[in-house]
């Protein structure tokens, strides 16, 4: 098994930032009707000295395949501490690079669900 697949399995079996936040500033949930994956995210933010908003904490919950759950785990690790506006520019290529493997179009929908949830959540801020 290559290192990328091992990393995906590790994030699936031991997800980072899994659970719920106390008093989140925003919460959003969505699903993938093709495979039944469901991901929700909660965000806590604060205003930085320059006036921009920073993500202080993020948690995700849900259930689904190893790809969707690992993608959510990796994504929450990546964005914690980032300015919210910097998260708006994350794209398909970022998720693909983060996972490190080629995915079929159906599996890519699983991998992109957490990014979709994150971007819709920060749009609510």
Stretch-by-stretch model annotation:
Residues 47-50, 72:
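Intrinsic structural disorder/low-complexity segments
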Residues 32, 37-47:
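Short beta-strand elements
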């Amino acid at each position: 098994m290559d290192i990328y697949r091992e990393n995906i399995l590790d994030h699936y079996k031991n997800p980072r930032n899994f659970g719920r936040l106390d008093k989140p500033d925003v919460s959003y949930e969505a699903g993938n009707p093709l495979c039944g994956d469901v991901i929700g995210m909660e965000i806590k933010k604060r205003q930085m000295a320059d006036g921009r908003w920073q993500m202080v904490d993020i948690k995700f919950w849900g259930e689904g395949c190893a790809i969707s759950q690992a993608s959510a785990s990796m994504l929450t690790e990546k964005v914690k501490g980032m300015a919210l506006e910097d998260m708006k520019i994350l794209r398909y290529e970022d998720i693909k690079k983060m996972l490190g493997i080629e995915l079929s179009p159906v599996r890519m929908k699983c991998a992109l669900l957490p990014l979709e949830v994150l971007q819709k959540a920060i749009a609510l801020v």
